[in-house]
């Protein structure tokens, strides 16, 4: 299946097909002329797929080198970026060459940032290998790295030339790594897609059920992301809906220490906490927090952060990228399948941190 991201200045396709990673070279040959390519990945993904993708690209006429770094959210920083820059220079990459981001969200965010800044921007594509990356982070052009202060604090908007999604690679994920991706899938059902929510309701929550329906879950999620990115590429309006659960979720990730709490886990806890307080304030319908909680728990996602410290979380919130002056744009769900922006002051945001 192809989903067109029809952004006027940089349209591209998301290709979703079981087994398509084996044809990565042919796919890229249709996008780029033969040239130098650097595959940016982490050491874990490299051990599984780097050689396979490298050979496919070489068969299609590309000159290929591989750069891998130690896996983990804690490596998504400017130190790693500098190492990639140095590797690209040594390989002689020019503005006519490109980067293939092969991996999960950490790899995709970092490689995209490198591509968008190296020589003021070179071409790149995404081949996401985690559920979170396949349904969310590989699509839409947000790139970035973390700082000690906040997640994704340094970044750019830079669209890839294409996204290649092979649902079969999810079978090599660990249980926790697969399940955390469901945090984003559940979010899509809540903010935009009641049909997806109904599908999730019908699943039993097992790993087997996720893998069996992975292609459909990915397609639904990508369609929601497509709609919001096309209408609002630079995150000033409807695209903000995608941040449901992320305001508190990112604060949890930052205060826990990057890599301790996975992104989808933090989003799940953020959605539950925001909904609980918003429901108490009459801003979200009665019973919706219970529905969200039960859905997250069914798939094995955490719903409560055990190291909850209001002071530290609030400090992290002050660095939120959605803040404008002393106001945060909080995303709420007034009804299933619909989202809205609710501006709150940073002071009022403290209410949403009360357990």
UniProtKB/Swiss-Prot annotation:
Zn(2+) binds at residues 184, 246, 263. Pathway: Metabolic intermediate biosynthesis; chorismate biosynthesis; chorismate from D-erythrose 4-phosphate and phosphoenolpyruvate: step 2/7. Keywords: Amino-acid biosynthesis, Aromatic amino acid biosynthesis, Cobalt, Cytoplasm, Lyase, Metal-binding, NAD, Nucleotide-binding, Zinc. Pfam families: DHQ_synthase, DHQS_C. GO terms for biological process: amino acid biosynthetic process; aromatic amino acid family biosynthetic process; chorismate biosynthetic process. It catalyses: 7-phospho-2-dehydro-3-deoxy-D-arabino-heptonate = 3-dehydroquinate + phosphate. Binds 1 divalent metal cation per subunit. Can use either Co(2+) or Zn(2+). It comes from the Bacteria. Its cofactor is NAD(+); Co(2+); Zn(2+). Its main location: cytoplasm. Its EC number is 4.2.3.4. CDD domains: DHQS. SUPFAM superfamilies: Dehydroquinate synthase-like. NAD(+) binds at residues 71-76, 105-109, 129-130, 142, 151. GO terms for cellular component: cytoplasm. Gene3D superfamilies: 3.40.50.1970, Dehydroquinate synthase-like - alpha domain (1.20.1090.10). It is found in: Cytoplasm. Belongs to the sugar phosphate cyclases superfamily. Dehydroquinate synthase family. PANTHER family: 3-DEHYDROQUINATE SYNTHASE, 3-DEHYDROQUINATE SYNTHASE, CHLOROPLASTIC. Catalyzes the conversion of 3-deoxy-D-arabino-heptulosonate 7-phosphate (DAHP) to dehydroquinate (DHQ). This is 3-dehydroquinate synthase.
């Amino acid at each position: 299946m192809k989903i067109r991201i029809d952004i006027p200045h940089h349209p591209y396709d998301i290709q979703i097909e079981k087994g398509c990673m084996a044809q990565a070279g042919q796919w890229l040959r249709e996008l780029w002329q033969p040239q130098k390519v650097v595959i940016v990945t982490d050491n874990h993904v490299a051990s599984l797929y780097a050689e396979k993708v490298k050979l496919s690209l070489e068969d299609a006429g590309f000159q290929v080198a591989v750069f891998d770094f130690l896996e983990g959210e804690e490596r998504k920083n400017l130190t790693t970026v500098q190492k990639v820059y140095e590797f690209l220079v040594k390989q002689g990459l020019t503005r006519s060459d490109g980067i293939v981001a092969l991996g999960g969200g950490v790899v995709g965010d970092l490689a995209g940032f490198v591509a968008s800044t190296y020589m003021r921007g070179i071409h790149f594509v995404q081949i996401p290998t985690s559920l979170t990356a396949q349904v969310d982070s590989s699509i839409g052009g947000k790139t970035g790295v973390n700082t000690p202060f906040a997640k994704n604090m340094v970044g750019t908007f830079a669209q890839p030339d294409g996204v290649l999604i092979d649902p079969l690679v999810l079978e090599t994920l660990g249980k926790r790594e697969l399940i955390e991706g469901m945090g984003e899938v559940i979010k899509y059902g809540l903010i935009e897609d009641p049909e997806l929510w109904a599908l999730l309701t019908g699943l039993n929550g097992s790993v087997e059920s996720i893998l069996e329906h992975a292609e459909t879950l990915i397609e639904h999620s990508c369609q929601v992301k497509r709609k919001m990115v096309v209408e609002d590429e630079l995150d000033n309006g409807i695209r903000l809906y995608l941040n449901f659960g992320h305001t508190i979720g990112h604060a949890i990730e930052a205060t826990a220490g990057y890599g301790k709490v996975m992104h989808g886990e933090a989003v799940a806890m953020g959605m539950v906490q925001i909904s609980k307080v918003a429901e108490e304030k009459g801003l979200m319908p009665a019973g919706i927090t219970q529905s969200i909680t039960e859905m997250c728990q069914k798939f094995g996602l955490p719903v409560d952060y055990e190291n909850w410290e209001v002071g530290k979380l609030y400090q992290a919130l002050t660095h939120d990228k959605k803040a404008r002056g002393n106001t945060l744009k909080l995303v709420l769900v007034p009804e299933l399948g619909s989202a809205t922006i609710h501006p709150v002051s940073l002071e009022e945001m403290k209410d949403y941190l009360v357990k």
